[in-house]
Amino acid sequence: MAHQCARFHFFLCGFICYLVHSALASNSSSTLCFWFPLAHGNTSFELTINYTICMPCSTSQAARQRLEPGRNMWCKIGHDRCEERDHDELLMSIPSGYDNLKLEGYYAWLAFLSFSYAAQFHPELFGIGNVSRVFVDKRHQFICAEHDGHNSTVSTGHNISALYAAYYHHQIDGGNWFHLEWLRPLFSSWLVLNISWFLRRSPVSPVSRRIYQILRPTRPRLPVSWSFRTSIVSDLTGSQQRKRKFPSESRPNVVKPSVLPSTSR
C-alpha cells in the first residue's frame, strides 16, 4: 500500500512538473543579442523615420491611381490599394540600460538606433518574431531584443524579406526605380561599418591604438606650388642653354635691352 502511494505521488509530481514546464515553455521568450561596443562620447541625437509598410502595386493599377489625389504606387501589405493613412511616423526611443545616451560618433549612434528600430518594427529582417523589448547589457556590451520565439511576424505569403530581398522593381509608367527593401542593406552597411570602426579603435589591441594615434588629426601643412618650382627650373635651364648657345663674347651684335622686362604679371 505504501509502495503504491509513493508511486502515485511520484506520477502526480511528474505530471505537475510537466504542466509547469509546458506552461513556462509556451510563455518563455527568446533573446537575440549582438555584441556592440558601447564607446562613450559627447554626441547624441534622435532618429525619426517616416515610413510606409507598402508593397508596390501592379503597373496597370499604379497607372490608374497615379493621378488620383492622396494615392501613390505603394500598396499596404495584404491590400491592393495604398491610402494616405497608411503612412506613419515613428520616434525612436532609447533602449533601457543605456542611461547616459551617448555613443562615439554620429555613425555609431545611427547604427545603434537602426538596430533598435529594425528589431522593434521589422523583426522579420532578423528572422525573429514579435519583439517585446530592446535592451542593452552594458556589462557584456550586448544589445539584445527579446521576442516570442517565432520565426516571423509577417505571414509567409507577404514576407518582404523572403520575397523581395535585394530586388528592384521598375514602374514603366513612372520611369523610377524603387527599392522594395531598403532597410536590410542600409542597416547591414551601417552595422558592418561601425563594428569594423570600433574594432579598429578598440583600446584592447595595441595595434589598433597605434592606428588610432596615426590617424589623429594633424595640423595642415602649407601647399607646395609645383607650378612655381617648375617655372624656376625651366627658366634656369633655358637661361643656361641660351648662355651656352649665344655667349656674349662671341656675339658682339646682340642688342641688350635698356629696361628689364616686368615680372609683376
Curated annotation (Swiss-Prot):
Gene: GP3
Keywords tagged on the record: Glycoprotein, Host endoplasmic reticulum, Host Golgi apparatus, Host membrane, Membrane, Secreted, Transmembrane, Transmembrane helix, Viral envelope protein, Virion
Coiled coil location: none
Transmembrane segments: 8-25
Stated name of the protein: Glycoprotein 3
Record's signal peptide: none
Gene Ontology CC annotation, any one: extracellular region
Disulfide bonds: none
Subcellular location: Virion membrane; Host endoplasmic reticulum membrane; Host Golgi apparatus membrane; Secreted
Assembly mode: Heterotrimer of GP2a, GP3, and GP4. The GP2a-GP3-GP4 complex associates with the E protein.
Organism, scientific name: Porcine reproductive and respiratory syndrome virus (strain Lelystad) (PRRSV)
